From Swiss-Prot:
GO BP terms, alphabetized: L-methionine salvage from methylthioadenosine
Subunit structure: Monomer.
Protein purpose: Bifunctional enzyme that catalyzes the enolization of 2,3-diketo-5-methylthiopentyl-1-phosphate (DK-MTP-1-P) into the intermediate 2-hydroxy-3-keto-5-methylthiopentenyl-1-phosphate (HK-MTPenyl-1-P), which is then dephosphorylated to form the acireductone 1,2-dihydroxy-3-keto-5-methylthiopentene (DHK-MTPene).
Protein name: Enolase-phosphatase E1
Protein family membership: Belongs to the HAD-like hydrolase superfamily. MasA/MtnC family.
Superkingdom per UniProt: Bacteria
Keywords on record: Amino-acid biosynthesis, Hydrolase, Magnesium, Metal-binding, Methionine biosynthesis
GO MF term set: 2,3-diketo-5-methylthiopentyl-1-phosphate enolase activity; 2-hydroxy-3-keto-5-methylthiopentenyl-1-phosphate phosphatase activity; acireductone synthase activity; magnesium ion binding
Cofactor note: Binds 1 Mg(2+) ion per subunit.
Gene transcribed to yield this protein: mtnC
Length: 232
């Protein structure tokens, strides 16, 4: 693989374990959601996102219904922007009081630092909100890695399974799509990125994917088990 001009990476299942998100972050936000909404529901930023939830369900409803809806969305792993924003706010409190640190695979932390030192700009694209992404990298168990990242993208730029989202990112960072390497564990995301001309690599970590995906499903994407196998 030739050296890309920029690297765009996913988080869950790519730099970090799926189990940390599913077993630590999601349950934490679910438990904290009722108290957080009742305590901060009148804050303009929080109310903005709660109003988006109300608009989504199409009703003028009390906060208790919004809380139940948000908890259901967490259980369903909905990629709704308002949910992700509220989760990020809750996780921010958790990081500040050191209830947890964000999991980061050692190979990812080392390679991100090496690429940054080599002058390759790094970007993050995750379904989690941009503030949540920044907190994740700032409070990782490998230390504060947020300074390695040049810019951050979430679902405000579009769905991760739509090619148009990757075109927007390429335009935003000012690098031709063909010179961007996108890293993800989700084949449908890689398919969307490849339709724009981006280079792609599928992360298939044994911790997250004990059964390898079939060659037919992987298609033309490069398949690696960790970041150290990405050589250019």
């Amino acid at each position: 693989m030739t050296r890309p001009q920029a690297i765009l990476t996913d988080i869950e299942g790519t730099t970090s374990s799926i189990s940390f998100v599913k077993d630590v972050l999601f349950p934490y936000a679910r438990r904290a959601m009722p108290a957080y909404v009742r305590e901060h529901g009148n804050h303009p930023q929080v109310r903005h996102w709660l109003n988006q939830v109300a608009d989504e369900i199409g009703e003028d409803v009390p906060d208790d219904v919004l809380i139940t809806t948000l908890q259901t969305w967490i259980d369903e792993d909905r990629k709704h922007t308002a949910l992700k924003a509220l989760q990020g706010l809750i996780w921010g409190d958790g990081y500040k009081i050191a209830d947890f640190t964000a999991h980061m695979y050692a190979d990812a932390a080392l390679q991100l630092q090496a690429w940054h030192a080599a002058g390759i700009p790094l970007y993050v694209y995750s379904s989690g909100s941009v503030p949540a992404q920044k907190l994740f990298f700032a409070h990782s168990d490998a230390g504060d890695l947020s300074g390695l990242v040049s810019d951050w993208f979430d679902t405000e730029v579009g769905s991760k399974r739509e090619a148009a989202s990757y075109r927007r990112i390429a335009e935003r960072i000012g690098v031709p799509a063909s010179e961007i390497l996108f890293l993800s564990d989700v084949i449908e995301e890689l398919d969307a990125a490849k339709r724009t001309g981006m280079r792609t690599a599928l992360l298939e970590r044994r911790e997250d994917y004990p059964t390898p995906r079939s060659a037919d499903d992987v298609g033309s994407h490069q398949r690696v088990e960790n970041f150290s196998q990405l050589v250019f």
